[in-house]
Amino acid sequence: LNISSQQAAELFQNLVLNAQPENRSYRYNFLRDNCTSRAIDMIGKVAPFALPADKQPSTTYRDIIHSYTQDSPWLEFGQDLILGCDVDTLLNQHARMMFPLLAEQMLTQATTKDSLGNSIPLLKDETIVVNVPQAAPSATPFTPLMVAILLLCSTVALSWTELRTGRVFRLFDNTLMLVQGLAGLVVFVLFFFSAQPAVGSNWLIGVLNPLPLVWLPIKIMRERRGLQDYYLPLYGTLAAVFTLVVAGLQLQIIPTAMLLLALCLLMRGLISIIRWRCRPLLAGTSSDK
């Protein structure tokens, strides 16, 4: 830091005070109050600084997070499932400084004032304390998008077979509900019980919640008794339409793989409605395949 000895001493005292037991813990907020923002606030107290005019294109928290996860598609997909619409808001310079690497880039261009009021660079030099080699990304063809495409193709094939032959692939529907419910359990817990930001504004709670897990045993028992189940015709269809509407209205950025999964739900729901309403016209039904 390009600061005077008096400013350095003041910064040191502030750090000592911050390290006291009554001050050393705080509610961590990875978007707005994290280790980077705390360090920047400490610097700003002793050496107020200015940033150059913002010439960066408009970006969001989600865009920045994606820039760090582009080599890990499953990690990116998982984060997109739990982070809500709060991360889709446009950011100013100060908000972007919550990210360590972006903060480093901006601080190299920041200026402060010396004792005479002259504008000087905030940073005098840079030193790499620990040089950690970057790990090579592990490429895999089984990305969330590829898996979702394969699942959609399987859904189309099985649905067409049902319409042509009257056979019912209940095991496929039950597996789809199980996966939906397990993912929904994570989203549900974060949505209602987590104090972290963004997870409580997740529109995907409409399709990813524990309801499929709760209803799955009921569905199995009804089908064993030869009764029509209403999960896929009603909730499955509505949840899929809800997800597509959220994406269409741009209320939240929904990953493409999730949209394809919603199409699978929608297709199975519509097939269930057709099978339910047109059952006498079909060739008949059979057990799981």
Labelled PLM ranges:
Residues 1-135:
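Soluble extramembrane regions of membrane proteins in the secretory/endomembrane system
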Residues 1-29, 161-166, 189-252, 256-284:
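Non-catalytic ligand/cofactor/substrate-binding and regulatory segments of enzyme domains
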Residues 12, 30, 49, 77, ...:
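Phenylalanine-focused residue identity feature
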Residues 35, 100, 143, 209-210, ...:
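Alpha-helix initiation/capping motif
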Residues 88-94, 147-152, 177-180, 201-213:
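Hydrophobic alpha-helical transmembrane segments
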Residues 110-197:
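Core alpha-helical transmembrane segments of integral membrane proteins
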Residues 286-289:
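Cytosol/nucleoplasm-facing, intrinsically disordered, low-complexity tails
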